[in-house]
Amino acid sequence: MSVIKLDHVSYVYSKGTPFEKVAVNDVNVEIEKGEFVGVIGHTGSGKSTLVQHLNALLQPTSGKVYIDGEDMWADPKQVRKFRFKVGLVFQYPEYQLFEETIYKDVAFGPTNMGLSEQEVDERVRHATAMVGIDSADLEKSPFELSGGQKRRVAIAGVMAMRPEVLVLDEPTAGLDPMGRELILGQIREYHRETGSTILLVSHSMEDIANYAGKALVMNDGSLYMYDDVEKVFSHQKAIAEMGLSVPQVARIFTRLAEKGYPVNPNVFRVEDAVAQIRELIRKGENLHV
């Protein structure tokens, strides 16, 4: 069953003015419940604008957005409930922190859902533990934390609402490799534990290959492709023409295949590449890329 359906969705900035710009153009897609979807596209492709439609931050200029089969904008007075169903983490979410303690910041969303004090407490402690925040630190000011820790607190605040869909727009932007791996690992663990649908907007093809099951490709405001990650990245030439690149592992294996080595060129994850290289070595192949 699809948890998200976009039906001919378009969005135009500054419509009717000299600055009018089509940011999203006639997008049709259905995303199944429980999928982990990577959203990719060049800068200005419309990917961030697209995902802002999913929790009603933006209303389509035309077309409809369905969540769990319900037309999000059929009754504007009911839009608020979709913001609890679809959690959105912006780029640099640490700039959205505002409460005096970590606990209060993470509790803000669940409290506004009308949950009991006991339920809010359970959710805060569970979400912060999931992102690696020690319970002893919950009464600290979030502004005393490092950039990476602040980001984890901000993500925990959305996770604590337990949305059916969690949308993250470049959640690792500006982090060092260790910080990036930590946050992505926590998002994957959340996905495994809750079964929620995840949409991860990222410019890193390696991250999409390693964490997502499907990829949604935006190009100049239009949906170019939505399919399994392996199938999307097999279109290496088309992706390159959009100004994107496939994971480095894929480029290496494409060169190996071109040189006549018996490899599958459509390899995108390091662990799969290691397995193939070991098999080649076992067969006595001498690799020169």
Regions found by a protein language model. Give the residues of each.
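A short, flexible loop at the N-terminus of ABC-type nucleotide-binding domains that lies
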Residues: M1-V3, V12-D26, P76-Q78
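Conserved ABC ATPase signature
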Residues: S141-L145, Q149
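Conserved ABC ATPase "signature" region
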Residues: Q118-A136
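Catalytic Walker B motif of ABC-type/P-loop ATPase nucleotide-binding domains
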Residues: L166-D169
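ABC ATPase NBD Q-loop/coupling interface
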Residues: K15, K64-K81
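Helix-to-loop junction immediately C-terminal to a conserved catalytic motif
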Residues: N55
